[in-house]
């Protein structure tokens, strides 16, 4: 059998005519992505117990494979690993498994018998989509070890069964449900669980929920009512983005973290009585429409994308209490001409001022030690930047798309000066001018 192997990684199997039964050699720890792609001659496959990971699409379109013996040490089956293995009829997932990736067994149309360890909850979305097992599942709620993997029913009003502790990724995604009551037994709702449910109007959450993950209610454009219990400590990235009718929100008392764009485009954010959403001294979002913005004195961190695309702002003023400006904080503020930066700022995040096309000059204080990637990318009018001599770390393409006239000023030779010259931007030492 022809295997390409390097340092315990099976990189590729070269199919040989007439070989139907494949035994992977002992000592292999990883089967690399696409290693057996379209090996349609294989009917049975056995792997040694040394294998711990199967890469993305590793056995995709092995359409005649009927039987697979998995390693008893296997921890990770990556996305699409067995997609379109159309003759596979059964699979035994070993006790060692930690994660099964997105669509791992999708379109294994004859797969009817699936054995999963009793304590396994690391199941991603659509893992068994369009398999015989999923189609024949006797209940509308497909529940595996207290994990609600998928809802396949047609009811409009949903009450989550008491057997469910975790609502899985994409469990209700793009369905026509209109209302959901989550039981007190549910402890976790995973990312994108209800994304794209465009007819969903109301949701009742229990006090057992501590976190709403990324994109959980993404683009639920009819959602009008949801209670956020005080038990919630974190609302993730884009959790309610696109919920245009969501107007009545009371943030939980114990909320510690509000993700980037978590309520973007919502009626609540647009009608907020305050210009700012601030949680634990982090300015998470700006809701106002002022041309000159004074950042409140209690803010120490300007969060990721807090002012993104606020293209009516001309001037920003911040107090010296601010120590961090997050990723994309002022990205797309196309009218911004002037910004007063905190004298105690330490970190300037990725793309912080990307596409601030009216900004002509800016001074970065000596307190700054770290700058992320593309901080000033496509700032077409920016011709003068004063940089800190204490910067120790600078990301990639900070000045990408800069004006030909751009000149960077520093007080003395330093890391920032070397970085600037290396990227073919003019640099001048202030003391020598």
Q: Language-model segments: which ranges?
A:
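Structural signature of tandem-repeat unit edges
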Residues: 1-8, 14-30, 40-53, 63-76, ...
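Short low-complexity, flexible loop/linker segments enriched in glycine and/or proline
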Residues: 129, 423-424
